[in-house]
Amino acid sequence: MSAQPEQTVKLTVDGREVEVPKGTGLIESAAFAGVEIPVFCYEPRLGPPVGACRMCLVEVEGIPKLQAGCTLTAQDGMVVKTAQTSPKAAQGQNATLEFILVNHPLDCPVCDKGGECPLQDLTFRWGPGASRMTFPKRTLEKPIPLSPTISLDRERCILCYRCTRFSENVAEDGQLVARNRGALSLITTFEDEPYSGAFTGNVTELCPVGALLPTQYRFEARPWEIQNVPTVCGLCPVGCNISVTTREGKAKRVLSRNHPEVDGGWLCDKGRFAFGHVAAEDRIREPLERVRRRGFAPLSWEAALDRAEALIRAAGGRIVTALSGSETVEQAYALGKLLRVGAGAHSAVLPEATSSALDAFAAPLSTIGHAELVVVLGDEAVTDRAPIVDLWIRQGRRNGAEVTEAADGNSLPEELTERLRGSDRAVLVWSGRGGGGGARLAELAYSLGFEGKPGCAAFHLPATPNARGVADGWAAAAEGEEQDPEPVALLVVSGDEAAADPAVRAMAERAEHVLAITMYHGLAVGWADLVLPGTSYLERDGSYVNLEGRVQRLRRATIPPAPDELAWISRLAERFGVAVSPHAAVVFAELSERLYDGLAYAEVGERAPLPARPAYQAPPPAAVQPSPPPPAPPGEHFLADLRLQRYRPLFSGPAVERTPELQFQRPPAEIELAAEDADRRQIATGDTVSVRSNGTAIELRARVSRALAAGTARIAEEHAGDLHRDVEVVKA
């Protein structure tokens, strides 16, 4: 059956005839004709237009009064005149700007929006050259701290309602509201509580004036002093496209670059505000060697490479490499060549990665926003693993999709399974731990007939930003069987995220030597014999593979305090007779032949495409089986009748820990208990409880949840310490 031709309408804008799809708004229709209609409040991503600012006034033939262009839909035969051809519309826009500026403070020289302000630009083009008002301007208390991350200047606010509409329609938190009415309207939060949530910072980018500003950027730079470096966020697997604003080589703010298929122009607060971690006080800026009784002593780079070479050679291949999933593909590949080819060490602890079998069901994340049925699997909140995916799910629900949650693919009701099988716009999202999650999801999608349906997709949300790329890069570095060296002569730990893995921590305790590659004086340093400085995603050139399977470019925005990983890996590999380039582009060209069908570095560009879907290839049976939980270690015995679930909240991890403005968002030190288990123990929310596990005991605040399954308990990973999988919880 052939597709129905798209219905179109013809209209005339400023004497130019244009044909557009039926239902297109007038603002977009005018843009098709090459005519700009100025706007303040209009933003299609925020939902239906509200016509609040009246900046878009146009004259429509047959209608006596000026109309708000943003509220109009193109009609066949419509004749529109904008301010460029209609004196009436020009006068209306001039008057609109004059009224907006009546109480505006005109403090452009000290306003952080000055030089990149739509109000400045439109006033220059369409507004009055001078004010007729002689009375004093209204003054208000300022700045108002909406939260530790956002400052509000109410004198500058033009009441476009972009911020309140974002809060109500996109984030759906309803925290930002307009209090009072008319000229007395003020933007605020209910009960003046701090504006908190995963996505609050987006209002600072939506604001068309300097009313809402990130506190980190106030009085930091002017637009003519900065550079905006296009790169990709490296704090979760979505891979949001960002611009890092730098001044004199230092990061000052992060803005969205709006990839409509990946992030839709939104950022989470972690990605927007946590850039300050690169300047943390405990940053490691030079190699360190453990010296008996004296802690650590700094080393020259030459001496550090000598020491690293000696450790690797002495290990004789009995080396395990623990990768965090934050490395670039090039770093993982280069480290793999050094250790696998140069030292014959093939054993690695890799982050939980998305299965390549899911490539057969790959699709842009924006597919979720147009789905009719979304099923979320797993036991972790989508916001914690991939926050922007949560916004896509919310958008899908607003567009009419049914959103259902289930524990796993094995427990789907038969009726839901049949609906998934019969749908052409169904999406599966797996958010949770468990070995084989991606492979099991691929099998489920295949069994539901998703293959060959462009509107159907399956997304696995890894816990780390580049899990897929790191696993692929390590595997492509060399051929060789995975080993299980015992005892471990050398443990190479890359990043504090890897060090937080209980399996890695247990291995570090019994390894003869530990080489840590890390940015901070954190967990990994406590075990290390040799520490080599690591870098942030803001300081790297290279590539990441996001959860869609999209290869994206990282560009260095700030200069690291020490040589980056590729630089010293290249020098160290040379000592083992292995050729590794210190340049990411050269390394990418080499690995691309093995991984990406020869994709050129330049082809990745600033807005990377999504590869075409291959035919489905079933994952090996071992990949589909859930990983068995590690056995409880020997030690003091407790009646441990609850299974502990560790999870990583969005506002956790090394970057957030080192961002003062985000401390109010960090997870409380608490344990979440199922209501049934709490009742048995006579525990209520707010009680202090002791959590015990094989000789380890910690005290936490209890929170009772009716959404948690009986027999399980949840603790944020940063508060779980050395607790094992089976715990006992008693009232303290």
Summary of predicted features, one role per range:
Residues 344-355, 400-409, 447-467, 513-521, ...:
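A generic structural motif
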Residues 2-25, 31, 43, 59-63, ...:
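N-terminal export/assembly segments and adjacent metallocofactor-ligating motifs
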Residues 42-45, 336, 370, 374-376, ...:
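A cross-kingdom feature strongest in bacterial/archaeal respiratory oxidoreductases
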Residues 56:
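Acidic, glycine-enriched active-site microenvironments
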Residues 212-218, 245, 251-253, 321, ...:
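Acidic/polar loop patches that form or flank catalytic/metal-binding clefts of enzymes
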Residues 37-39, 46, 51, 68:
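Charged, low-complexity terminal tails
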Residues 358-359, 411-414, 522-528:
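Glycine-rich, charge-decorated loop segments at or immediately adjacent to ligand/cofactor-binding or catalytic sites
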Residues 305, 407-484:
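Active-site phosphate/pyrophosphate-binding segments
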